[in-house]
Amino acid sequence: MALPRITSPHAKGSNRTQQVMLQVLLATVPGILALTWLFGAGTLYNLALASLFALAFEAAILAARQRPLAFFLKDYSALVTAVLLALALPPYAPWWLTLIACGFAIVFGKQLYGGLGQNPFNPAMLGYVVVLISFPVEMTSWPAPHGVAALDGIKHILGIASLPDGWAQATALDALKVNKSLTIDELRAANPAFGHFGGAGSEAVNLAFLAGGLYLLHKRLITWHAPVGMLAALFVMSLLFWNGSGSDSNGSPLFHLLTGATMLGAFFIVTDPVSGATSNRGRLVFGIGVGVLVYVIRAWGGYPDAVAFAVLLMNLAAPTIDYYTRPRSYGHRKPNSGFKLGE
């Protein structure tokens, strides 16, 4: 009896790139709904523009590289980058700001290195940091919750008309950084940006992204190592340097966990399988490094929220982390640590 020969591996996973990306997009829905409830249609406008621009840049570069458009566009990786970037940008951001951010994310953050699976940096965070440094006024103009009408927002995005004075307000992280003379209780009483534990409305947004992250964990699309490492490190750092609600306080552990882009970063950014560490121990170290850097930059740096900077800095360290945390090779007692000095 002739037995057929097949090439190994004989078992393969059921998750294709397209399916994984669709699951990630699905997991962002709770956060999108929370942001839309808080800021109105501005988040949806960002999502529509970012998706359009990201797909256009992706198609243009693929055409220039003479790659099949349909095959690569259908993996939805550009769409995931667009969604993460749109969620990080302020609602009702000008169209040209979204265009520049998407251009840097897709062209310089992804395609310049060869496309999906080759990028050393998280593309969405690279695009975000470029526009944050280049256009700080526009990037720090967050609208007050429930404070902008949909039509006025569209006019502002297109540059037809400006929004009324007072439409924007400082976020809780902004207020904490620039009002060091006030205690936490005084800030909470005087500033509507503060909620019970974190930023007003930001608590619900972070919990929504936490729900999406738990869905990804349930589907085994991510592991717990990087998110737990980041959140635990941020909690410990904020606990060590928390002195109550005095005027020199940097905020409580709950404040840091439920304010800004903490949960979005922990479950959707830090877990990037390409630009992060690859082993489980490496992912844990990577997440801890991000959490420490987030607190350091929030407390003593020049930017109120620091998830993007922390992730990009740890992207630089990811190869070194992989080098020292690589698992033991089969048949060897110790991990294969690569070359040694003197060899």
UniProtKB/Swiss-Prot annotation:
Purpose: Part of a membrane-bound complex that couples electron transfer with translocation of ions across the membrane.
Assigned protein family: Belongs to the NqrB/RnfD family.
Membrane topology summary: Multi-pass membrane protein
GO cellular component: plasma membrane
Taxonomic lineage from the root: Bacteria, Pseudomonadati, Pseudomonadota, Gammaproteobacteria, Pseudomonadales
PTM-bearing positions, type FMN phosphoryl threonine: T171
Cofactor or coenzyme needed: FMN
Record-given protein name: Ion-translocating oxidoreductase complex subunit D
GO BP term, pick one: electron transport chain
EC number: 7.-.-.-
Keywords of this entry: Cell inner membrane, Cell membrane, Electron transport, Flavoprotein, FMN, Membrane, Phosphoprotein, Translocase, Transmembrane, Transmembrane helix, Transport
Location(s), subcellular: Cell inner membrane
Gene this protein is translated from: rnfD
Transmembrane segments: 24-44, 45-65, 69-91, 124-144, 197-217, 221-241, 251-271, 284-304, 305-325
Quaternary structure note: The complex is composed of six subunits: RnfA, RnfB, RnfC, RnfD, RnfE and RnfG.
